[in-house]
Amino acid sequence: MQEVTHMITKREFLNTNGCATLGWLTHHQKGERPPLTFAQENRFYIGTRIGQKARDQFPNGQLISGINNQSVIATTRMALQKTQNGVFFEAAFEANDFIAKADIVRKIGTVYHIIEVKSSTEKDLSKSEGREYVEDLAYTVWVARKAGFNVEKTSLWFLSKDYRLGDHASKLFSKIECTQAVDMLVPVYDSKPNSIQATLQNTNQPTPKPITDCKNCDFNHQCYPDFDAMTIYQIPGLRTAKHLEAGRRTAQDMVGEKLNDTQKRAVDCIIDQV
């Protein structure tokens, strides 16, 4: 196993917040991830291209770079301190061993506007479909504020559904200010550092607990070698959270539970195949 690094990333923080086991594995298995699939490489490529399109809207912006995280953090602080007004790409912040990078930072006097660029189309931030994007941005803002930067405004840039080939580049993004939604999450994150650090610094992996997200988790078979036998995840449209909490794991466990006709047929088919 690779040596565990001290600094905690956004991905590790958010993963641990949702599932202690996932966060621990993410932190302790750095460098052990399998090679990217073609689909994953393609998503990264598209994300990079979209990020560049966002930067193009700030032709005088400055890219922050360095040989490692610490150098990027130091360069960020120096650049922001010596500039009265400016735009910065890939600025990095660190506070109490938590690190975050921002796609775009605008500095106006003594205040900052953090922008995160997404490669998906616009999401409703008041619903579950948009929550992960707000959580992602809130982490960056939380770390930046802890590092001493006065972040007063935050925005998410999504791909505009109205953009058409040939339109001006300024129409490519749907720009949503989400300062209020982010500000509501920052105090929640303020209560998390001690427990998250304790989890990640523990040499023992936390005991996994089945949750809804296990279905698509990269580590589901590592946590549960018999995961394929947990057939409750194969039932369509099922709100699995309450059933998992009650100890139900298989289609057989769902016999007699309140299900719609489609779910009942799925349960019967799964049981017949066992």
What are these regions (language model features)?
Residues 142-149, 201, 222, 237, ...:
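Hydrophobic/aromatic-lined pockets within catalytic cores
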Residues 78-184:
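Mg2+/Mn2+-dependent nuclease catalytic core
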Residues 215-238:
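Extended, structured, electrostatic nucleic-acid-contact surfaces
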Residues 53, 136-140, 188, 192-195:
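Alpha-helical scaffold elements adjacent to nucleotide-binding pockets in ATP/GTP-utilizing enzyme cores
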Residues 1-111, 240-256:
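Metal-dependent nuclease catalytic cores that hydrolyze phosphodiester bonds in DNA/RNA
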Residues 235-274:
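Accessory alpha-helical DNA-binding modules that contact the DNA backbone or grooves
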Residues 188-212:
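Polybasic (Lys/Arg-rich)
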Residues 26-29, 67, 207-217:
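Short coil/turn segments at secondary-structure boundaries
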